[in-house]
Amino acid sequence: MRLIARAAHRLQSAYPHIAYHLFSGNADDVTERLDRGLVDFGVFIEPADLSKYDFIKLPMTDIWGVLMRKDCPLAARPTIRPQDLLGLPLLASNQHLVKNEFSGWFGEGYEKLNITTTYNLLYNASIMVEEGMGYALCLDKIVRTSGGSPLCFRPLEPKLEVCLLYTSDAADDMQCV
């Protein structure tokens, strides 16, 4: 999001009357709005089905991991392995392609995971984690975990990275980023 914010700031400096409307959602929400002409472009996190769009990969990656309370036993580990998650109450993204990505990372025992809650926006899941509802499978740096936050993030091992993608209906718009 920081890359988009910087580009928006440069554009607004040159054209001060531009107004922005930000919409946050999962890939399903954003592609629906793109298809209906309600948004001009979208920033996606892989995996996402963008087969009907022109897109470019942004020059950054993010990593998957687990958001948890700092006072839980897993917080002492530097990384989280598949077997560490067995028997724990998990909050996971409700996106179908994300489920496929995690099942590939986890391996044969994916069906044994105790996914108690699904979410479409991590902010809401982070409140559930903060209140002791479980552990959220998520991307790093979306929820604040520094300072006085009771939460921490631990990356998955083996590492599960994702790329950020920018898509737009009009190829000319891609030059703005």
Predicted segment positions?
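Flexible hinge/capping segments at coil-to-helix
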Residues: 52-64, 68-90
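Conserved small/polar residues in nucleotide/adenosyl-binding loops
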Residues: 166-171
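Secondary-structure junction motif
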Residues: 88-109
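Central regulatory/effector-binding core of bacterial HTH transcription factors
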Residues: 1-50, 110, 118-119
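Short loop/turn segments at beta->alpha junctions
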Residues: 26, 81, 120-121, 139
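Short beta-strand->loop
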Residues: 54-65, 136, 140-141, 149-163
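A ligand-binding cleft/hinge motif common to bilobed small-molecule-binding domains
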Residues: 43-52, 105, 122-151
